[in-house]
């Protein structure tokens, strides 16, 4: 399973090539405002040969999405998946992000994958009906062997947002900020 944000490459005949678990890690910082660490992966086979992958992950206090910066060699396209559970939820794609909302007992969970428009390359659903193999994927273009994307979730009982509309507005605002970052010029 790609869980929420795991990478894979679709090959011929709907065969997926996926990275395995990380083989090494390095904690860069673990402060009160930001946690930052790096994950190294063993080389893995893609549809056209060997893939090299390293991720730098940051999670800022108060944010609902973690930022994942990937250094990747061996492909110019890749996808990040969200595992589809037994009961099909609602998939929504908007500009440069994808959400999957599903009921969970008496609550709702919403997973999200987001990227910049320059990396965005659509989305697709892979649903062979096999447990842990059903996913919705956000597709990416790799630029200069790098990719930046964001992964997170919302749980309706967290009381962090007043409802799904507020969560959706948070995502739309965040997508706009990611696409138009603040720049500071010092003279």
Label each region the model flagged.
Residues 1-61:
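Extended, loop-rich substrate-binding clefts of extracytoplasmic carbohydrate-active enzymes
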Residues 35-39, 53-55, 66-68, 80, ...:
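Hydrophobic residues positioned within well-ordered beta-strands of beta-sheet architectures
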Residues 41-45, 59-63, 72-74, 84-86, ...:
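Beta-strand elements of well-folded, non-transmembrane domains
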Residues 43-50, 105-111, 121-125, 157-161:
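Short, surface-exposed beta-strand/loop "edge" segments at domain boundaries and coil↔beta transitions
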Residues 51-53, 64-95:
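Acidic (Asp/Glu-rich), glycine- and aromatic
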Residues 79-132:
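Polysaccharide-binding surfaces and accessory modules of carbohydrate-active proteins
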Residues 115-187:
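Beta-strand-rich recognition/accessory modules
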């Amino acid at each position: 399973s790609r869980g929420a944000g795991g990478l894979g490459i679709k090959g011929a005949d709907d065969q997926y090539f996926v990275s395995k678990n990380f083989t090494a890690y390095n904690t860069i910082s673990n402060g009160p405002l930001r946690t930052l660490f790096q994950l190294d992966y063993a080389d893995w086979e893609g549809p056209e040969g060997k893939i090299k992958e390293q991720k730098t992950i940051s999670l800022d206090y108060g944010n609902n999405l973690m930022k994942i910066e990937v250094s990747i060699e061996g492909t110019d396209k890749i996808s990040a998946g969200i595992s589809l559970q037994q009961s099909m939820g609602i998939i929504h794609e908007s500009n440069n992000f994808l959400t999957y909302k599903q009921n969970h007992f008496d609550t709702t969970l919403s997973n999200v994958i987001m990227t910049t428009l320059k990396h965005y390359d659509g989305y697709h659903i892979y649903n062979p009906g096999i447990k842990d193999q059903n996913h919705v994927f956000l597709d990416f273009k790799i630029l200069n062997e790098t990719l930046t994307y964001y992964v997170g979730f919302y749980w309706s009982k967290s009381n962090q947002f007043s409802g799904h509309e507020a969560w959706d507005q948070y995502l739309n605002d965040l997508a706009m900020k990611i696409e138009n970052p603040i720049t500071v010029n010092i003279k």
